């Protein structure tokens, strides 16, 4: 991208944004009507017109049913898509809406509907219009939550979701360049007041960005931080993969490691770096638990408890560690974790008994 964040995106730069998608059979463009997504649609249409052969483009607008203006905005997107020669669909999020956690629920519904639209269109990718500004906001949100390296890596350019690749071709592009591009082309766009609603976290953080920028913490810097942490995260993931292989080799294939259970030799596990041990636990709990992803903070507490239990077992001598009775046993995110017989065991936690079961036959 150009160093001038207020200059329109050139034809050449736009080609680079979409170049890796040329061989896709079809693409779904997620377009709400705001400036970022309208720019995505306009740039993608211009790129596609320059190809002799390329993917079929389908524009999809999700109406969450949360604002009366949304239906009108969807119709305007349809008009713009038609002018660009693109197919358009409007999908609606139906049913009751939650009273808390509305942004997250709306996001999940949107991605679910987009994945359905992609499968119907034979598309391999769904393209969203996340920008460098969005990346900076995401980094701030996760920093305030106390996220680890993986969380602070924020959004990736490509992510697999529900069997569809979620692509973010504008992730390195500032919002100001997209607006400049639309103004140069005299293309209109909608203004969603939700983006300024201080009842939600992201708009509040967005309002702080100018003050952070004045201190050197602008969107470019925060996005660069995210990219560097993503690089570090990828390296730690490779180390964790190697650690899993190391632990399996130590067991010579005798210990369970699969869909039903995981088991690690405690002394070998203890020799690994703390971050790698955390990720091994997270992977096993997420794979075998039935209550969703485990929280990093809770797994950190679990690891501390395991370390203390292993140290206590070592101090008590080999007899205490070999008697087979659990030294530690707890559930987390639907998984059962125990330390017994010198091994860490992780498997699905027993399902809670229903009231009918408690009453007996």
Each model region followed by its residue ranges:
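AMP-forming adenylation/ATP pyrophosphatase catalytic core
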Residues: 2, 6-36, 54-58, 64, ...
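Core alpha/beta nucleotide-donor-binding catalytic domains of modification enzymes
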Residues: 2-208
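Non-catalytic, surface-exposed connector residues within folded enzymatic/regulatory domains
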Residues: 71, 100, 199, 216-219, ...
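Non-catalytic alpha-helical coupling and interface elements of nucleotide-dependent molecular machines
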Residues: 119, 145, 187, 210-217, ...
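Residues that cap or delimit alpha-helices
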Residues: 174, 212, 273-274
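Mid-to-C-terminal catalytic subdomains of enzymes
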Residues: 181, 185-227, 314, 327-332, ...
